[in-house]
Amino acid sequence: MTKDRVRIVYRNNYERIVEESNVRNFNALVEWMEDFNEGNLVPSLVLFGRDLGSNFSINKSNVKTIEFID
């Protein structure tokens, strides 16, 4: 399985699919996801999209689930 797509489900049930090719700091997202899923304390993370103005942030209080998808 290629691990190049991550599904984020927010507490308001909004779902976002993040692909490695669309985010500059995808590895930081993967590290954040692993820490989050292990129950560790995680800081806010700003993800930088490849398109101008496509940045977004995630934090522990607004994410319900985060996982790799096929």
Residues covered by each model-derived region:
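A short, charged, amphipathic alpha-helix used as a generic interaction element across diverse proteins
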Residues: 26-44
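Absolute protein N-terminus
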Residues: 1-2, 70
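Intrinsic disorder/low-complexity segments enriched in polar/small residues
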Residues: 16, 20-21, 35, 61, ...
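N-terminal acidic leader/helix
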Residues: 2-32
